[in-house]
Design a protein with these regions (language model features):
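C-terminal motif of bacterial Sec signal peptides marking the signal peptidase cleavage site
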Residues: 17-20
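Blade/loop signatures of beta-propeller domains
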Residues: 24-58
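Beta-strand-rich domains and repeat architectures in extracellular enzymes and scaffolds
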Residues: 52-85
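Blade-loop segments of beta-propeller domains
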Residues: 59-64, 68, 95-122, 130
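Repeated scaffold domains used in trafficking and secretory/extracellular systems
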Residues: 67-71, 111-116, 150-159, 209-212, ...
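Conserved blade-ending motifs and adjacent loop-strand segments that build the rim/top face
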Residues: 243-268, 315-347
Length: 398
């Protein structure tokens, strides 16, 4: 049974209260101004946030190509990694342990491995299929399946309640839905674009491979949903509480330039606008990854660093800035001499990123990097048959 509890009026009241005042008065939401963040630049080094950097090779059998990593989690001395080969577990040193499920139509099998998440309380791995959630134990044994609808793209977990985010397309009723253990919906956040008028067929979709809806900080789940949404929610089980607002100012993408409204206009005009793809946090900073809505040259399938802003928001100083200096954007690697680092995932002890060997090789040559002896020794052992590399930045502790 599909049960939905809408709290749009509460959300709108919170939004109005927060956007009417930029200060942190009691009862208002913290608001981060995107334009203010862009007004300042600062060079950052990895040693500012981490005390160690590790390159970890994922070592798998020859018939498994663990490449193009989309998500990483850590639980019980093992890495859970989502790549083009599926969702797999690796030991602490990167040795392959197991694969969760396989493609097919039987129990525990899936048609599309869209996303996954780890329930740290029940010690279960949950895979998002095209219309269901499939549960496994940490060793890869199938446990059960529940329905979740057909529009969920990303999932997160809070106290065993599964939250699913959609692409917020005009054909999807909700931005996010919470499901109980039986697959029934508990709460939903409405999609303001649902059934909105459009110029063309209204089926255009745009998303980024760097889009991350969920992150955890101090054992609390936070949800950003799609990048056109400017609210960060704090998740407590089935409750989603507006927690932080992003004021995009003149960079806010208008509805008329959404991909579903008019795809041609989106392709040719939306490059003026930006969205925040992901949020991470530690004691000092918010780590904000922002991307231009489309490429100004129409090269939408080509990665260009000019289409990204890597922003730190300093909680103590109450100000944000773009990480950019003489040595480039992001965190300069002053430990191993490798390419610049930017965190994509947070495991608690480590900030994590990933790179392919051939991308690393290209960056070393293009940027004329001088690797440390330790990293150079590792690099000399890698080649075209090397799987993806996890880059682990161990956090500094106060």
């Amino acid at each position: 049974m599909y049960k939905t509890i809408h709290f749009l009026p509460l959300f709108l009241l919170s939004l109005l209260a927060a956007t009417s005042c930029q200060s942190d008065k009691p009862g208002s939401l913290k608001t981060i101004s995107y334009e203010s963040c862009l007004a300042s630049k600062r060079a950052m080094h990895l040693s500012d946030i981490a005390d160690t950097l590790i390159y970890l090779e994922l070592k798998a059998p020859e018939d498994i190509v663990a490449s193009r990593v989309w998500k990483v989690r850590w639980i019980d001395d093992r890495w859970i990694v989502h790549s083009i080969a599926g969702v797999m577990a690796f030991s602490e040193d990167g040795t392959y342990l197991t694969t969760y499920g396989r493609k097919g139509g039987g129990p525990g099998e899936y048609t599309m491995d869209n996303d996954f998440e780890v329930d740290t309380e029940k010690k279960e791995v949950i895979m998002l299929d095209s219309h269901q959630l499939i549960y496994y134990d940490l060793d890869g044994h199938y446990l059960r399946s529940t329905n979740c609808g057909e529009h969920i793209s990303k999932i997160g977990i809070s106290h065993s309640v599964v939250w699913g985010c959609t692409l917020s397309h005009r054909t999807t009723r909700d931005r996010a839905v919470a499901f109980d253990a039986q697959g029934d919906s508990l709460t939903s956040i409405p999609n303001p674009f649902y059934m909105a008028p459009c110029i063309d067929a209204g089926m255009g979709v745009s998303t980024s491979k760097y889009w991350e809806s969920f992150h955890t900080y101090q054992d609390m789940l936070y949800m950003k949903t799609k990048e056109d949404n400017d609210t960060l929610y704090q998740i407590q089980g089935e409750k989603a509480i507006p927690y932080l607002l992003f004021d995009m100012g003149k960079y806010k993408q208008p509805m008329e330039l959404q991909a579903w409204y008019c795809y041609e206009d989106f392709l040719h005009k939306a490059y003026k606008y930006w969205g925040i793809l992901s949020v991470l946090a530690d004691e000092r900073y918010y780590y904000l990854t922002a991307q231009r809505c489309t490429d100004p040259d129409g090269e939408i399938f080509k990665h260009k660093e000019s289409n990204f802003h890597y922003i730190l928001y300093d909680k103590e100083l109450d100000e944000g800035f773009v990480t950019d200096g003489p040595e480039g954007t992001r965190f300069t690697d002053d430990y191993l001499g490798g390419p610049a680092f930017w965190p994509r995932w947070d495991t608690g002890a480590y900030f994590v990123s990933t790179i392919e060997w051939y991308d690393l090789k290209q960056l070393i040559n293009e940027e004329k990097l001088t690797l440390s002896p330790d990293l150079q020794k590792q690099y000399d052992e890698w080649g075209y048959d090397t799987n993806a590399l996890l880059i682990l930045a161990r956090k500094k502790h106060k």
